[in-house]
Amino acid sequence: MSIRIIPQDELGSSEKRTAEAIPPLLFPRLKNLYNRRAERLRELAANNPLGDYLRFAALIAHAQEVVLYDHPLQMDLTARIKAASEQGKPPLDIHVLPRDKHWHKLLHSLIAELKPEMSGPALAVIENLEKASEQELEQMASALFVSDFASVSSDKAPFIWAALSLYWAQMASLIPGKARAEYGEQRQFCPVCGSMPVSSIVQIGTTQGLRYLHCNLCETEWHVVRVKCSNCEQSRDLHYWSLDNEQAAVKAESCGDCGTYLKIMYQEKDPKVEAVADDLASLVLDARMEQEGFARSSINPFMFPGEGE
């Protein structure tokens, strides 16, 4: 099954009535996203061996919140939605969408917001980024989008990605269409931008019990049924791992068929779980999965692979 975004004027009346039965997509709601993430990161840092890094990530998330409101994005995506729908492609496809200079503005604003909070190596990194040319910034963005992590140092990548993610999330929040589930390609990539998930969440509330994968770039969430590998769609050899007990709010879902795993979080166990923060705070579980021979099928926006990984 794949998910395709349909222009509003192309939805039939029956589709409009049933569109909310099981929403295939949950577009980003930016009003409280970054503040909530920053708060969760700070909370998780209290008793975590990676506490300092979680607090560092919280500073970036808070800066994203500030910059979001300082630099709103105005854009009409109607034509792009229509063209993408006709081509069967994600409307904000990271591999073909032209990037404008808005994301450069976001990056420099993030740097300005973060400089007073940074010191030592982190300060040196953002000062180096501040001096980078537009061409250098574009080269780093393009490298990250094709997973060429050897071309972008792992200390620069989170800052570059924070600006790109904010830009793509702003665009995704403006999409004037609905989503429709269709037979076709797999759902391992985001239907809005084509990027990878960071983790998945089994939700509460109006989407009680439904699993949604959370995009690590545009912050969109898309529905994937439970007890099925989100990477290869097989269901015969799935196992669930946790560091605590069977009632843990954060687990790793491993697939013996493709040899990968993805974190799955349960809001019914802890309503405060957050896709990025709780994934980053459970890196010990990642280490365990690596020991068991599984490869991660997702990337956290604050933890990019280094050269040679």
Curated annotation (Swiss-Prot):
One of its GO terms (cellular component) is cytosol. One of its GO terms (molecular function) is ferric iron binding. GO terms for biological process: protein maturation. It is found in: Cytoplasm. Gene3D superfamilies: FdhE-like domain. Keywords: Cytoplasm. Signal peptide: none annotated. Coiled coil: none annotated. Its main location: cytoplasm. Belongs to the FdhE family. NCBIfam families: FdhE, PRK03564.1. Necessary for formate dehydrogenase activity. This is Protein FdhE homolog.
